[in-house]
């Protein structure tokens, strides 16, 4: 279709819809959208679709791949809508909520099981050693470098909701994101409760339900490696046991 002198590109979408107040079961709704030159990422298209149909529900915030709000399943693979290039997607673009979590409405999932596991690993530095109030707890450059590839996690849940072990045991298995963050504090030279952190994970489910499927690595929008972090925790546990 032409708009002025420009040929407008049209894209088709099939989006998961479910409103528990009115729908007996979920369904896929088809949408057509004539793209504007400013439609670069999938989130751009979703925002425009919502302008046409204000009942369509999804989370979004920063639009920069920082907040992690707009995680969803895009053509069968978890990702962030704001980082997903729009025009290269196979059509119709099939968009579903992140798998393995209860659906609140449309593409919005209940993140409670995910954040329960995250909070269970005490995601903060613990150090009871006294220090002068006008000083910081210092690290060498080498100690700081140990945290690279760990602290960048934005808690979007793309990795944990791509993990079959988390689907099956969300109340028992910490999940890739939680375990990546657990290792982030185990590896932190300023933290003094390493043994407590390891004891917290020394359970048939919490850590050892990872089967190195590596879906987490494949979908992480920040290109992190939870499987490697999980392996590091297991290695530390083994060294502690012998």
Q: What does each of the following model-derived ranges do?
A:
Residues 62-71:
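Short, structured protein-protein interaction patches enriched in aromatics and acidic/basic residues
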Residues 76-96:
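Glycine-rich phosphate/adenylate-binding loop and adjacent beta-alpha elements
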Residues 1-7:
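Short, Lys/Arg-enriched N-terminal segments with co-localized hydrophobic residues
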Residues 8-13:
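Short structural boundary motif marking the start of a folded domain
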Residues 53-59:
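Active-site phosphate-binding and catalytic loops of NTP-dependent enzymes
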């Amino acid at each position: 279709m032409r708009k002025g002198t420009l040929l407008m590109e049209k894209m088709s979408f099939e989006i998961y819809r479910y409103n528990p107040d009115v729908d007996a079961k979920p369904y896929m709704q088809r949408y057509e959208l004539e793209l504007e030159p400013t439609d670069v990422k999938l989130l751009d298209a979703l925002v425009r679709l919502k302008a046409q149909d204000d009942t369509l529900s999804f989370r979004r915030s920063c639009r920069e791949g920082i907040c992690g709000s707009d995680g969803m399943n895009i053509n069968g693979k978890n990702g962030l809508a704001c980082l997903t290039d729009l025009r290269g997607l196979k059509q119709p673009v099939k968009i579903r909520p992140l798998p393995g979590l209860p659906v609140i409405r449309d593409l919005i999932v209940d993140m409670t099981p995910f954040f329960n596991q995250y909070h269970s690993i005490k995601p903060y530095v613990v150090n009871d050693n006294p220090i002068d109030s006008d000083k910081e707890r210092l690290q060498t450059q080498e100690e700081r470098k140990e945290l690279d590839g760990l602290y960048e996690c934005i808690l979007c849940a793309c990795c944990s909701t791509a993990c079959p072990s988390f689907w099956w045991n969300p109340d028992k298995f910490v999940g890739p994101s939680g375990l990546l963050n657990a290792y982030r504090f185990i590896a932190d030279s300023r933290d003094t409760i390493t043994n407590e952190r390891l004891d917290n994970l020394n359970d048939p489910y919490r850590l050892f339900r990872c089967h190195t499927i590596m879906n987490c690595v494949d979908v992480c929008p920040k290109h992190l490696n939870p499987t490697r972090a999980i392996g590091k925790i297991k290695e530390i546990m083994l060294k502690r046991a012998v």
